Amino acid sequence: QADINRIERKAFREHARIENAVAAYTRELCARLDEQQFTKGIQLTPIPEGGDSVLVVQLSDLHFNEQVNLPSNQYNFTIAAQRLRKLAQRVKQLGASYGARKVVVACLGDFLNSDRRLDELLSNCTNRSQASLLAADILRAFLLDLREQFEIEVYGITGNESRVNKELGWSDELATDSYDLMIYEILKRGFAGADGIAFCGFRANELLFEVMGRTFLCLHGHQI
C-alpha cells in the first residue's frame, strides 16, 4: 500500500507541476497582452461611412508551422505571411471596386499544423507553443492591413489538426482544447478596445453569422 501511495503522489506532483506551469504561462501571456495592445502606437483610420457592400474573407487550413521544401512548392511562416499580405491587397481591391465598408473574417480552423504523426513532427518549423505566437503575430498584421480600409468583424471555429490532444473530441469542452481558440483569444485580447475591430464569436464545431440578411454556416472540412 505504501508503494501504491508513493506512486500516486508522484503522479499527482508531476500533473500539478504541468498544470501550474501552464497556468503561469497563461497568466504571463495575458499580462503581456494587456500591457502591449496590438494597436498601441498605431493611428487607426476612421471607420468608413456609407457603402452597402460587405466582403466575407475565409481563413481555413493555414497550417502555420508546416514546412514544405519541394521543387514544386514551398511553405513556411515567411511564405504564409506573404500570401496573407497578397490576400489583404486583393480584398482591398475588391472592396474599392464594390464600395465595401466592412469585412467579415471567418476563421474556419486549423491555424496550426498537427504534430501527432512523426512525419508531421519532423516537418514542423518549431514547437506549437511558439508557433501559436508567431501565427497570432502574422494574423495581427493581416487584420491591421485590412483595418486600413474597412471595419472588421471576426468569427471562428475549431478545426481538427490544431487540437491539443491526440483524440478528436466533439463536445464543446474537448473541441475547444485547441490552438485555434488560443490564437483567436490572443487576437481578441490584443485588439481589445480597438476601434473598428470586433471579435464577435467563437464556437467549437459550428457557428452561424449573418451578413446583409444572409446566414452563413461555419464548418471545418472534417465535418462535411
What feature does the model see in each segment?
Residues 1-224:
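Extended recognition/assembly regions associated with phosphoester-bond processing machinery
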